[in-house]
Amino acid sequence: SLLRAGFTVHVFDLRPEVVAKVVEQGAIGAPSPAALGATVDALLILVVNAQQTEEVLFGEQGAAAQLLPGSVVIASATVSPEFAEALGQRLEALQLQFIDAPVSGGAAKAAAGEMSVMASGSPAAFARCEALFDAICARLYRLGERPGQGSKVKMINQLLAGVHIAAAAEAMALGLKAGCDARALYEVISNSAGNSWMFGNRVPHILEGDYTPLSAVNIFVKDLGIVLDYAKKSFFPLPLSATAHQMFLQASAAGHGGEDDSAVVKIFPGIVLPAASAKGGS
């Protein structure tokens, strides 16, 4: 979406095939985050977690030391609010601007420039990146000037997403155990009050027997872990989140951590899941 909007895009990824694919579309490949940082005035980091964000910025080949003063760092991983707050302070000490900007929407919406972005940062940083956000997202929610506010909202989104996926899996598992036709059950629930966005989006993966990861089980092990760690510090109970977290942990422990998060349905005993279709995966 950035290339379509006319930006000069420099890209780095640990997977050469990913870089090559974007270069074919007109981007310029970089051999390291440091090399990339030396060529850009806005650095958009789309990685999985805090550790990867840290490595991109402050690792042996980190970008932070190469960015010019006044450059903007936009970090979009789902991380704890505390990490985002501390990151903002570290970047400010380097005279860099920071936007805490976790995203929602997945790879398809990212490619189409239709993501939702939950962002917090200074008005000056947003002003510099207005055209960039116009290119990558359909909805930009400006949630304040302090880093961490965007990550707090993303954390709550992930609480709901994880609980809804776990609930959808549990509902389908009980339906299969009860002898319901899986596709008929999906059709009825999709048009009834029990439906949710996650039910409508994830249950087709179960019906097709296709657990090719679009968002993996281990993502929700991480994200619900962030939710529970944050709540624990203020002695705040989250019984549904805790149960959903245990379900994803159980799926991961059984060897399904790298599969699509809908594979949490595989933890339920005594049911026969739909087999992979000809176009499906494993």
Q: How should these model regions be labeled?
A:
Residues 1-46, 71, 110:
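NAD(P)+-binding Rossmann beta1-loop-alpha1 motif at the extreme N-terminus of oxidoreductases
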Residues 9, 29, 97-99, 140, ...:
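Hydrophobic beta-strand scaffold residues
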Residues 33-98:
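Rossmann-fold NAD(P) dinucleotide-binding segment
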Residues 78-158:
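Rossmann-fold dinucleotide-binding core
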Residues 112-113, 117-119, 141, 147-178, ...:
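Active-site-proximal catalytic alpha-helix in oxidoreductases
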Residues 151, 160, 195-257:
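Interdomain hinge/lid region at the active-site interface
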Residues 181-191, 242-246:
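Beta-strand segments within the central parallel beta-sheet cores of soluble alpha/beta enzyme folds
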Residues 249, 253-282:
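NAD(P)-dependent dehydrogenase/reductase Rossmann-like domain
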